[in-house]
């Protein structure tokens, strides 16, 4: 891979990283300020803040991986640093996906209209248990990732002990195929929350269809607040599903480099696509949340006023 292509993709990745940090930091900052002001936090704000923090960490890990690939390519052949990066990438990836799934589940229970006793019971208790669900997602992600990381590091530790007795440096390498297969297994686990999110999406569509049908039969129109809430929730869920599919394909592209030689370009390109998912989805969430949307418009208006004031002062001085 030429230096020109490396530099171009790296700068594009830095740009995506900056946009993603800006959007997710804005979500976290607005919700935390509201939390301090009101001394309590709503369930939806807690989910969005947790999701924003996990995605900030995910963006940092992906960008660090890009830098390591470009500046220290030998680390991808062997080394403990690679395993550490992979562990935190997989962990933050799992947390981000689980938290996004929690958001989809929350939308489903708060907006959908079903009359099954179990659904009504869950709908009534969702605000009380959402913090425990988020905590459970964190614990589950850590327990899934730690054993796999220990398996990867076991060979490394055995090699260090062997090197003290012999000079077998070749034994300190974990094969690329073994490493890639472990990463593939860890990311296949994310298909579970993806399936849950997909199920909530279809149930929301069913609820919306039934609601519109009732509105048509009662001749009250279809653009009532409940319909608008359904549409906003569906936009947030379907954007997550589409971006997650693109993210998963980018991961498969990056993982292919472990089996095909000389594919650093595929890795960087895959990571460039991977950055789109945590970066762009944050802005979709901002536009779909009334409080965040108002705060963003207020910030935008303030920035425009400052810029206009500076231009006026410069024109006055001239």
UniProtKB/Swiss-Prot annotation:
The chain crosses the membrane at residues 10-30, 56-76, 95-115, 129-149, 188-208, 236-256, 267-287. One of its GO terms (molecular function) is bitter taste receptor activity. SUPFAM superfamilies: Family A G protein-coupled receptor-like (SSF81321). One of its GO terms (cellular component) is plasma membrane. One of its GO terms (biological process) is detection of chemical stimulus involved in sensory perception of bitter taste. Residues 31-55, 116-128, 209-235, 288-318 are cytoplasmic. It comes from the Eukaryota. It is found in: Membrane. It is a multi-pass membrane protein. Keywords: G-protein coupled receptor, Glycoprotein, Membrane, Receptor, Sensory transduction, Taste, Transducer, Transmembrane, Transmembrane helix. Signal peptide: none annotated. Residues 1-9, 77-94, 150-187, 257-266 are extracellular. Glycans are attached at residue 167. PANTHER family: TASTE RECEPTOR TYPE 2, TASTE RECEPTOR TYPE 2 MEMBER 7. Gustducin-coupled receptor implicated in the perception of bitter compounds in the oral cavity and the gastrointestinal tract. Signals through PLCB2 and the calcium-regulated cation channel TRPM5. Belongs to the G-protein coupled receptor T2R family. Several bitter taste receptors are expressed in a single taste receptor cell. This is Taste receptor type 2 member 7. It comes from Macaca mulatta. The lineage of its organism: Eukaryota, Metazoa, Chordata, Craniata, Vertebrata. The gene is TAS2R7.
């Amino acid at each position: 891979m030429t230096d020109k292509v490396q530099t171009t993709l790296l700068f594009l990745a830095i740009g995506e990283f900056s946009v993603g940090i800006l959007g997710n930091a804005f979500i976290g900052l607005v919700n935390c300020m509201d939390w301090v002001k009101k001394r309590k936090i709503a369930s939806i704000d807690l989910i969005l803040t947790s999701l924003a923090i996990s995605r900030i960490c995910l963006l940092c890990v992906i960008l660090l991986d890009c830098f390591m690939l470009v500046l220290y390519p030998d680390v991808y052949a062997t080394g403990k640093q690679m395993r550490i990066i992979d562990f935190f990438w997989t962990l933050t990836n799992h947390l981000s996906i689980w938290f996004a799934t929690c958001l989809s589940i929350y939308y489903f229970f708060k907006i959908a209209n079903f009359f099954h006793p179990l659904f009504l019971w869950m709908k009534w208790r969702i605000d009380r248990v959402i913090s425990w669900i988020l905590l459970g997602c964190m614990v589950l992600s850590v327990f899934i990732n730690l054993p796999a990381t220990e398996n990867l590091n076991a060979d490394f530790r055995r090699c260090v002990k062997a090197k003290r007795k012999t000079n077998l440096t070749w034994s300190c390498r974990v094969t690329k195929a073994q490493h890639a297969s472990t990463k593939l297994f860890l990311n296949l686990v994310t298909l579970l929350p993806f399936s849950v999110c997909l199920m909530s999406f279809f149930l929301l569509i069913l609820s919306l269809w039934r609601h519109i049908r009732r509105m048509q039969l009662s001749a009250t129109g279809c653009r009532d607040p409940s319909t608008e809430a359904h549409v906003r929730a569906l936009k947030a869920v379907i954007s997550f599903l589409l971006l997650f599919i693109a993210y998963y394909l980018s991961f498969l592209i990056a993982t292919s480099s472990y089996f095909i030689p000389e594919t650093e370009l595929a890795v960087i390109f895959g990571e460039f696509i991977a950055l789109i998912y945590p970066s762009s989805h944050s802005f979709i969430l901002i536009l779909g949340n009334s409080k965040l949307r108002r705060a963003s418009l207020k910030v935008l208006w303030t920035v425009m006023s400052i810029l206009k004031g500076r231009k006026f002062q410069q024109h006055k001085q001239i």
